[in-house]
Amino acid sequence: MLEGLFDADRWSTTFQNMGPFWEGFGVTLQVVVAGLLLSLVLGTLLGVFSTTRSRVLRAISRVYVEFYQNTPLPVQVLFMYMAGPQFLQAITGADQPVRIAPFVLGFLGVGLYHAAYISEVIRTGIEAVPRGQMEAAQSQGFTRAQAYWYIVLPQTFKIILPPLCNQALNLVKNTSVLALVAGGDLMYRSDNFVSLYGYLQGYIVCCLMYFIICFPLAMLVQWLQRRSQERPRGVSLAGLGLDNVEEA
């Protein structure tokens, strides 16, 4: 079979069937964008919860993170695929299970999963911001929510950009789990091609297409890491009365 990797006829057949690969590439990109948005919003919310004074909010964040970090993503997606339609039938009162589109399964699966990891990144970033920033903001009349929104989170995202991009990379690669539920993604299309023709060229094309998505992100991570090492650690917030605040 390995000798066939260099077979011109097999490559010709592969190139003649690139349409499904590009369709899968498009589906994967859509799942990546939607999953990233979901994981960023939910992860930020959970990250803030984990640093609040409320025991209830901290507990919600902790339970969520522990559950998603300690159960496999394929199991989570398969569970949503099998149980989700019955759950929707129960809450909507439909006569039969409500079908969930593979795209929805995909972005919910990777989005909810990576929100747990992003929340930990957010929490670490928030804890890296001097606590005096929050106290100084509140002394200037900011509510706690306003202090998070205008003071803490902007600094947090500057600190955590490199690890955040790493999570984006992992999310891209984890979209391949959609192949388990016939999601129409890149991995699913590649599996179909290899099953039909028996040519490993399908997986080579799949790898190259994932590389097209992931390599620019990897370069962005390296660039951000260099920038973060060059950037001065002090943060000036002139105009808000919060510049040069030291950690309490």
Report residues per predicted region.
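Transmembrane alpha-helices and adjacent helix-loop boundaries
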Residues: 1-248
